[in-house]
Amino acid sequence: MGDREQLLQRARLAEQAERYDDMASAMKAVTELNEPLSNEDRNLLSVAYKNVVGARRSSWRVISSIEQKTMADGNEKKLEKVKAYREKIEKELETVCNDVLALLDKFLIKNCNDFQYESKVFYLKMKGDYYRYLAEVASGEKKNSVVEASEAAYKEAFEISKEHMQPTHPIRLGLALNFSVFYYEIQNAPEQACLLAKQAFDDAIAELDTLNEDSYKDSTLIMQLLRDNLTLWTSDQQDEEAGEGN
């Protein structure tokens, strides 16, 4: 059994044990062998890092909320400790994101040929996602540059997906979902977010008969998430409009 197969086996085992740091480390090593990733390999890489970064994002949100409360309480001593801990989590999160972005630029996006539309969109979406995660914790000039990089990656992926993929394709739908979240949460542009999500949902509904049996479950799940977000976002906007005259 070659190195590559051993690493993949370790990644699958780590996934079953829910040891995502180990899983990410194995998939990073697989990627650095600089051979094309199969769909399964690609998904292993994505799942590993999504869980690794997800744990840090969740911790960061909890600590940020404690920091806000501590600030309001005026407890300076505690605030210093909380702030230092938030910064520690931030550094971990940034390291994970930068690892993924380096793999994408050095190997994955770079090695896609002109006809590997699905892989290209998958990796560009991933690039948009990890710059978005950096944007969640960044501020000032640093935030501006990661926001721009995130939008550029999403836009490039979006153009390729519109030209070469069915509206019901789960990767195209997943991209629309995350790109619309980027507009809503990072750019604070609810109208643009709703427009993008609604267009993606409507386009998919219009071509439901093209739904691939293999991806039916994935596609319909993402369509449901798009619809849930639209419901939430439009009710938020209505609440704001209703409250504007108060």
Swiss-Prot record:
The modification Phosphoserine is found at residues 25, 59. One of its GO terms (biological process) is positive regulation of DNA-templated transcription. GO terms for molecular function: actin binding; enzyme binding; identical protein binding; nuclear glucocorticoid receptor binding; protein domain specific binding; protein heterodimerization activity; sodium channel regulator activity; transmembrane transporter binding. GO terms for cellular component: cerebellar granule cell to Purkinje cell synapse; cytoplasm; cytosol; glutamatergic synapse; intercalated disc; mitochondrion; plasma membrane; presynapse. It is found in: Cytoplasm. The modification N-acetylglycine is found at residue 2. Keywords: Acetylation, Cytoplasm, Phosphoprotein. It comes from the Eukaryota. The record marks 57, 132 as: Interaction with phosphoserine on interacting protein. Adapter protein implicated in the regulation of a large spectrum of both general and specialized signaling pathways. Binds to a large number of partners, usually by recognition of a phosphoserine or phosphothreonine motif. Binding generally results in the modulation of the activity of the binding partner. Negatively regulates the kinase activity of PDPK1. Belongs to the 14-3-3 family. This is 14-3-3 protein eta. The gene is Ywhah.
